Amino acid sequence: MTEDKFVRRSLRTLSAGLEALGHEACPTTVAGWLRDLGYNLRVNVKRLTGPTHPDRDRQFRYLEEVIAEFRAAGLPILSVDTKKKELVGNFGNPGAVWVEEPYEVNAHDFLSAAQCRAAPYGLYDVLANKGHVVVGTSADTPAFAVDAVARWWVRCGCKRYRDAGELLILADSGGSNGCRPRLWKQRLQMLLADYYDLDVTVCHYPRGASKWNPVEHRLFSQVSRNWAGEPLRSPERMLSLLRGTRTQTGLTVTAEWTNQKYRRGEVVTDEQMAQLNIEHHDTCPQWNYTIKPRAPGWWHWN
């Protein structure tokens, strides 16, 4: 007898196996016996996150402090991340919707049948409870991420926070806006700090803690709920569903589309990194830093 604490066979198979051994029991009876023994049908539980970083709790406490400082000063706090890529075309979308007849969609999600593969980059304004999504059709690179932040600043941020000289960005520690990509920091220096004369502070969430990033549960969760069961048949339809996302707490969402191309693998040299005006914080410097404007003229970059 094994030490397994689970049963893989179906109730009918177990019933037939018992009958072969001379014990008659219908599938319903077998199910009752299993429950009496403490067995139930269960799905996998995603609970194990692996070893946590030793500075995880310290970083969360520091995040609370920095957010509180910016909130008290009325300075913009922007939570950012890329939502999962979506195939634009007549493809099924998880969820149900009230309709007279079900939507007929493609049986297979082949990229060749899609108009494009869209990468929605979400930007959530924590103080204003407003969301903005820049949908790109190229690679999800640090250049795309910073361009999206710059688009938000021009379209929303500079109007909502006219006298602000500082910006706090909350981001995951991985991905296009992670703490490692040099291009993310270089583009923030050139496109935001230098060009718009902003002190840009970035605080990253520790590995495995992306669900605590406000953009995930304040913006992306509402977007997913709004377009559940709705095929994203065209760019216009996708933008319409994004812009139609609202909540009773006042969340509204704006959205825009960009077909700009981004190259993967852009390299930032040590010399270029040395030219950045970046200050790493004393607390968890790998996750917290402020990029300040350089002398006038630096924004005339190639």
Which residues make up each language-model segment?
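C-terminal accessory extensions appended to soluble enzyme cores
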Residues: G229-N302
